Structure formats: C-alpha cells, structure tokens
C-alpha cells in the first residue's frame, strides 16, 4: 500500500465514526447554525469596546438587512496591575472582561439563548506614554475579539436547541 493510499484509507477510517453518529457541520445546508449566517443584528455599540465586539460578531455572523435574530449585550471590564517594580511602578496590566449576552427572536422578542463569556488580556506599560496607550487599546481590542468568538461558539453549540429551521 503506497503512502497516498494509506493516507486516504486513514482519512476514510477517521470520517466513518462522524458519519455514523449523525455528525453534520454546523454551517452546512440544514445544519443547526446555518440559520445564523447573515440573519443576526447586533445592538449598536456605545463605546470603543462595543464597536470592536460588534465588528467581530459581524465578521463571524455576517451583516444583515433582514434580521431574524438580535443580540443584546452588556460589557464589563476591569483593569488591575500585574507587574510591579521595587519602586512600586506598575509595568504590566491585566484587563479582565465579561459579556452578558442574549439572542432574541425578532418576531416574538423571545430570548432563545443567553449566557456570560469571559476572558482576559494583558499589556505592558514599561515604554513611553504613547506606546502604553497604544498597548492598552490593542489589549482591549484583542479582548473584545476573544469574547465575540466565545459568543459565536456558544451560539453555534446551542443552535440545535433553539433553531427550528
């Protein structure tokens, strides 16, 4: 058996259990999360963190003109010093964030899915004031992207329970 044939055989062997258990890709036609794409409107942002969150959610779910669902959210962030020098100067900060979110059916206003996601990022404050401000802004953007990805993952994972299309 050649190397190519062996790889093909192993690929088929790995795929068989997935087919046997009824595995369907989430975004496939008829898949549980297919109804999310280009059908979700995210509440308008009110600050930079909200803008970064909405931008990432729209990247992942698409921007819609005819929304079937709406995502509402509340962002909470805290900043704490992590790296402290012998002169009590903070050189590293940690930004922790949580988002409470709800997926709402536009037709009925029923809450289809809700949850809380959380994560953290860090940034260095040991450079110039300009680099510190830039690092902080980048850390906040990274945090919102992480949290948006967690929201989308949660919606995909639960879509089989609430998406009846």
Which residues are covered by each model-predicted region?
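N-terminal export leaders
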Residues: 6-11
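Bacterial Sec signal peptide processing site at the extreme N-terminus
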Residues: 19-38
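Acidic/histidine-rich, surface-exposed loop or edge segments in extracytoplasmic proteins
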Residues: 34-45, 127-131
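Post-signal-peptide N-terminal segment of Sec-exported extracytoplasmic proteins
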Residues: 43-74
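Sec/Tat-exported extracytoplasmic proteins
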Residues: 61-65, 103, 107, 150-159
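Surface-exposed short loop/turn segments
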Residues: 64-114, 122-138, 145
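C-terminal/domain-edge helix-coil "capping" segments
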Residues: 134-165
């Amino acid at each position: 058996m050649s190397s190519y044939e062996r790889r093909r055989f192993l690929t088929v062997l790995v795929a068989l259990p997935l087919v046997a258990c009824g595995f369907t890709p989430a975004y496939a036609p008829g898949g549980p999360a297919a109804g999310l794409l280009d059908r979700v409107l995210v509440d308008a942002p009110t600050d930079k963190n909200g803008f970064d969150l909405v931008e990432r959610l729209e990247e992942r779910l698409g921007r819609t003109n005819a929304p079937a669902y709406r995502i509402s959210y509340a962002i909470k962030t805290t900043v704490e010093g992590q790296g402290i020098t012998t002169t009590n100067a903070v050189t590293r900060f940690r930004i922790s964030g949580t988002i409470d979110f709800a997926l709402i059916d536009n037709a009925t206003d029923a809450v289809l899915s809700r949850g809380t996601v959380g994560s953290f990022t860090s940034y260095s404050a040991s450079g110039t004031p300009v680099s510190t401000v830039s690092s902080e802004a980048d850390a906040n953007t990274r945090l919102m992207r992480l949290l948006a990805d967690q929201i989308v993952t949660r919606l995909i994972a639960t879509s089989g329970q609430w998406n009846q299309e």
